């Protein structure tokens, strides 16, 4: 479990470019662009799905919940990062 959390923290920090402890839509978009083409609509859909409290940012807790529900996707992202 501790290894899983450490890996998620590592990935989260890659997305959290300014280190403020949350991922904005622009940080999400910039990081996803390194993985390939992504549209603004796709970024907004992802934000809406992951940002469960609707504050406009993805917290580590929200990221962790999303990662656990989508472990295959996160494993693929981990391989890239």
From Swiss-Prot:
Ca(2+) 2 binds at residues 51, 53, 55, 62. One of its GO terms (molecular function) is calcium ion binding. Ca(2+) 1 binds at residues 16, 18, 20, 22, 27. InterPro entries: EF-hand-dom_pair, EF_Hand_1_Ca_BS, EF_hand_dom, EF_hand_pair_protein_CML-like. The keyword Metal-binding applies. SMART domains: EFh. It comes from the Eukaryota. It holds the Pfam family EF-hand_7. Residues 3-38, 41-73 form the EF-hand domain. Keywords: Allergen, Calcium, Metal-binding, Repeat. This is Polcalcin Syr v 3. It comes from Syringa vulgaris (Common lilac). The lineage of its organism: Eukaryota, Viridiplantae, Streptophyta, Embryophyta, Tracheophyta.
């Amino acid at each position: 479990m501790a290894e899983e959390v450490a890996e998620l923290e590592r990935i989260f920090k890659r997305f959290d470019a300014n280190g403020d402890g949350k991922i904005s839509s622009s940080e999400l978009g910039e990081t996803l662009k390194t993985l390939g083409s992504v549209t603004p609509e796709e970024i907004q859909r992802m934000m809406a799905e992951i940002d469960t409290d609707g504050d406009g940012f993805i917290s580590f807790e929200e990221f962790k919940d999303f990662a656990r529900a989508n472990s295959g996707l996160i494993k693929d992202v981990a391989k890239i990062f």
